[in-house]
Design a protein with these regions (language model features):
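Outer-membrane beta-barrel signature, preferentially recognizing the C-terminal barrel domain
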Residues: 30, 180, 269-290, 322, ...
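Structural signature of Gram-negative outer-membrane beta-barrels, strongest in the C-terminal barrel
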Residues: 239, 339, 347, 361-475, ...
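Gram-negative outer-membrane beta-barrel transporters
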Residues: 377-384, 472, 494-575, 595-598, ...
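N-terminal periplasmic accessory domains that precede
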Residues: 75-78, 100-105, 116, 128, ...
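C-terminal beta-signal and adjacent terminal beta-strands/loops
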Residues: 211-212, 476, 570-572, 587-633
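Periplasmic-side early beta-strands and strand-to-turn transitions of outer-membrane beta-barrels
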Residues: 150, 170-171, 190-276
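Short acidic/polar hinge/loop motifs at secondary-structure boundaries
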Residues: 120-145
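Extracytoplasmic beta-strand/coil segments of soluble accessory domains associated
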Residues: 76-120
C-alpha cells in the first residue's frame, strides 16, 4: 500500500492556498491564445504541412503546452487521454514488464498503431512502447486515425502517432527540476541553446504491494518492486536543413512477483519473483530541404530486454530475453504542379531479432517500398488525394508483395467548415520472432490486412472547434494469443479471425477567453472479433465501447490550474468476468514563484479508483501525488 505522507485534505489546502497567492501579480507564461491554436499545422497526415481544417483525416494534436498544463507523466499518459485511444499497460502510464509491453491502441485494434519519433518508427515486435521517450523533449504529438499503410507501411492498421521533438533555437537556458511524491520522485536537467538541446533525468518508483485485481476467489496477488529509470536525449541542428536526434533509456531492477501464488520447484514451492532490465536507444538524422522539396531520414531503433526468474529450479534469464533492432531509411520529393501536389518516395526498413538465451533463435526481415500521393485541387472548395504504396517484404518464413491504396476527399463548405472522406488499406506482418519458443508452426500465421472507411466534419469558429467523425474498420486475420495450453500453460500467437468496429467520435473545444478553456469528447464503437475456426463462430466484443474525455483549465497571472478526465466504459468480457470501467481524474496546478522558478502540484486518480490498465487485471496506481520544482537559469 502506498505511503500517504501527505493526506488529500492537506494537499487540497495547499492548493487552495496557492490559489490565493497569485492575485495581482505579473504573468510570465506565454499567451494562451498562441499556445492553444484550434487549427494547428500538421505534418504527419499528408507527409506535408497542412492545417487541421485542410486535412482529410481525423486528428488529435497535443502540444508541449498541453503536456505541461495537464501534468501528463509521459508520452503514453498524454496519448491515452485522447478520444478514440485506449491503451494496454501493465501498471501506471504504460508500465512495461519485459515484452509485456504497454502500448497505445487506436479505435480498439490492439497492436495496430504505428508510433514514430520524428518519423522514425519505434515499433518492435509490433509493440509501440513509448516509455523511452523523454517528456521534456516533446514539442508536439500528432495522432492520425484511420488505416495509414499507404504513406507509412506496415503496422499502421488503426492509425499513426508521430512524436515531434523540440528543435534548438532561441536564447540559451538551463532548466533544473526535481519531483517528490508518494510514489514517484525524479530529478533532471535540460540545456537548450541555439544549436543544441541536451536533457538527462533519473526516475525512482516505490514498491506497490498490490498491483492486480482479479475476480473474487483468485489466488493471484501481484506486487511491483522499487525501480529506477535513466533517460537522456539530444537534439541538434547541424545545419539549417539537417537535424540529429538521440534518445536513450535504461531501466534496472524493475521487479514483480506474487504475494501468495507459487510454483513447485522440485519439492519446494517458490513465490513468483522476476526482475526486468530494459535498455533502449533511438537515433536518427533528418534532412528537410528548404527549396528543393526533398525530405529524408535515416534512423536506428534498439531495445534489449532481459528478464531474470528468481523462482526457477536454476534461477536465471527468462526465455523471452532478446535484442531487437530496426534500421530505417526514407526519402521523399514533393512536386508542386500548379495548384496540385505530387509526393513520391522510397522507404527501406530492416528488423532484427536475437534471443539472448537461445542464440540460434535469430531472424531478420527487410522491407522495400515506393509510395506516391497525388493531391488534385479541382476548385477552391474541393480537392481529392489518391495514394498508392507498393512494398516487397523479405520475411524469414514467407515473403509478401503488398499494394496499399488510399483515397481521400476534402470539401470546404466555407472558410470555417470542411467535410472529408478517408478510405485506406493497411497491412501488418506477424512479429519477426513469431515461431521461436512458441507452439505455432512456421507458415500458420497469416498477415493482418483490411480497410478503414471514415467521413467527418470539422468546424472552427469564434475560438471554438467542433469535430465529428464516423468510421468503419474491417480487418482480416487479427493476431492475438491462444488459450493456455493445458499441458504446458503456454500461450502462443494465432490468427484470432476477423475484426470489425463501427463507431462515432465527437469533440468540442472552446477557448472562452484568455483565462478559461475547456474541451469535451465522446466516442462510441463496437470492436469485435470472430474466430471462423470456432465450433460456433460469432462476433465477440474485443475492447471497450464507450470512450470519453474532458478537461477544463483556468489561467491567470502566474497560475494555471486544470482538471483532466478520461473514462472507458462497457469494456470486454475476459477471463470469466467483465472488465470494469476505467475512470481517471487528474488535477494539475502550476505556479510561477518568480520569473525563473515554478512549482507544480499534480494529483492523479483523484477519485482513488481501482482502474484496470488492461484486460488482465493489472492496475493503475491508486490516488497519488507529486510536487515538481523547476528552476530556469
Amino acid at each position: 500500500m502506498l505511503k500517504k505522507n501527505l493526506s488529500k485534505s492537506a494537499l487540497v489546502v495547499a492548493l487552495l492556498t496557492t490559489t490565493v497567492i497569485w492575485r495581482g501579480t505579473t504573468a510570465y507564461a506565454e499567451d494562451p491564445n498562441q499556445a492553444f491554436t484550434l487549427d494547428p499545422m500538421i505534418v504527419t497526415a499528408q507527409r506535408t504541412e497542412t492545417r487541421d481544417l485542410d486535412t482529410p483525416a481525423t486528428t488529435n494534436i497535443i502540444t508541449e503546452q498541453n503536456i505541461k498544463e495537464a501534468g501528463y507523466k509521459n508520452v503514453f499518459d498524454a496519448i491515452e487521454h485522447q478520444v478514440g485511444l485506449t491503451s494496454t499497460g501493465y501498471g501506471d502510464a504504460g508500465q512495461d514488464f519485459g515484452f509485456s509491453s504497454g502500448r497505445t491502441v487506436i479505435r480498439g485494434y490492439d497492436r495496430g498503431t504505428l508510433v514514430m519519433v520524428d518519423g522514425i518508427p519505434m515499433n518492435l515486435k509490433n509493440y509501440n512502447s513509448l516509455d523511452g521517450i523523454p517528456i521534456d523533449m516533446v514539442q508536439q504529438i500528432e495522432i492520425i486515425k484511420g488505416a495509414a499503410g499507404t504513406l507509412y507501411g506496415s503496422e499502421a492498421m488503426g492509425g499513426v502517432v508521430n512524436v515531434i521533438t523540440k528543435r534548438p533555437g532561441g536564447k540559451t537556458q538551463v532548466k533544473v527540476k526535481g519531483t517528490v511524491g508518494n510514489y514517484y520522485k525524479d530529478y533532471g536537467v535540460t540545456y537548450a541553446g541555439e544549436k543544441l538541446i541536451v536533457t538527462a533525468s533519473k526516475e525512482y518508483s516505490n514498491k506497490l504491494t498490490h498491483s492486480n485485481a482479479y475476480p473474487e476467489g483468485s489466488s493471484t496477488d501481484w506486487w511491483v518492486g522499487k525501480g529506477q529509470k535513466n533517460r537522456a536525449g539530444i537534439s541538434a541542428a547541424l545545419t539549417d536543413e539537417i537535424g540529429f536526434t538521440f534518445i536513450y533509456q535504461d531501466g534496472s531492477n524493475i521487479t514483480r512477483g506474487s504475494n501468495n501464488d507459487a510454483k513447485k520447484v522440485g519439492s519446494v514451492y517458490k513465490k513468483y519473483n522476476y526482475r526486468y532490465d530494459d535498455k533502449r536507444i533511438a537515433t536518427g538524422l533528418t534532412y528537410n530541404g528548404k527549396y528543393n522539396g526533398i525530405k529524408a531520414l535515416v534512423g536506428y531503433n534498439y531495445r534489449r530486454t532481459e528478464g531474470y526468474d528468481f523462482a526457477a529450479a536454476t534461477p536465471g534469464p527468462v526465455s523471452s530475453s532478446a535484442d531487437l533492432s530496426s534500421y530505417i531509411g526514407d526519402v521523399q520529393k514533393t512536386w508542386n504542379l500548379g495548384k496540385n501536389t505530387l509526393i513520391t518516395g522510397y522507404s527501406l526498413r530492416r528488423e532484427n531479432y536475437e534471443n539472448l538465451v537461445t542464440k540460434a533463435n535469430k531472424a531478420h526481415r527487410t522491407s522495400n517500398a515506393i509510395y506516391l500521393s497525388y493531391n488534385n485541387v479541382f476548385s477552391d472548395k474541393f480537392s481529392a488525394t489518391l495514394g498508392l504504396r507498393g512494398e516487397i517484404i523479405d520475411d524469414p518464413v514467407k515473403s509478401e508483395n503488398i499494394l496499399n491504396p488510399q483515397f481521400q476527399t476534402l470539401y470546404k463548405i466555407n472558410d470555417t467548415t470542411s467535410w472529408y472522406i478517408n478510405i485506406g488499406k493497411a497491412f501488418q506482418m506477424p512479429t519477426v520472432d513469431s515461431y521461436y519458443g512458441k507452439k505455432a508452426a512456421a507458415g500458420t500465421l497469416k498477415p493482418e490486412e483490411g480497410w478503414t472507411y471514415e467521413t467527418g466534419i470539422k468546424k472552427i469558429y469564434d475560438n471554438k472547434s467542433i469535430k465529428l467523425a464516423v468510421f468503419h474498420m474491417d480487418f482480416e486475420n487479427k493476431i492475438g494469443w491462444s488459450d493456455k495450453d493445458p499441458g504446458t500453460g503456454e500461450q502462443y500467437a494465432i490468427n484470432k479471425g476477423d475484426f470489425r468496429n463501427t463507431g462515432i467520435e465527437a469533440e468540442f473545444t472552446h477557448n472562452v477567453n484568455d483565462k478559461w478553456r475547456y474541451s469535451l469528447g465522446i466516442g462510441y464503437g463496437n470492436p469485435e472479433v470472430k474466430d471462423p475456426s470456432a465450433a460456433n463462430p460469432k462476433w465477440v466484443q474485443d475492447d471497450g465501447r464507450i470512450d470519453a474525455s474532458a478537461s477544463v483549465f483556468y489561467s491567470i497571472s502566474k497560475l494555471t490550474s486544470g482538471l483532466t478526465y478520461k473514462y472507458l466504459g462497457d469494456r470486454e468480457y475476459y477471463g470469466g468476468h467483465d472488465v470494469p470501467s476505467r475512470s481517471r481524474l487528474t488535477w494539475n496546478t502550476s505556479y510561477d514563484l518568480t520569473k525563473n522558478d515554478n512549482i507544480t502540484l499534480t494529483m492523479n486518480n483523484l477519485l482513488d479508483k481501482d482502474n484496470y490498465s488492461n484486460r488482465y487485471g493489472n492496475l493503475d496506481l491508486p490516488y497519488n501525488w507529486k510536487i515538481t520544482y523547476t528552476r530556469t537559469f
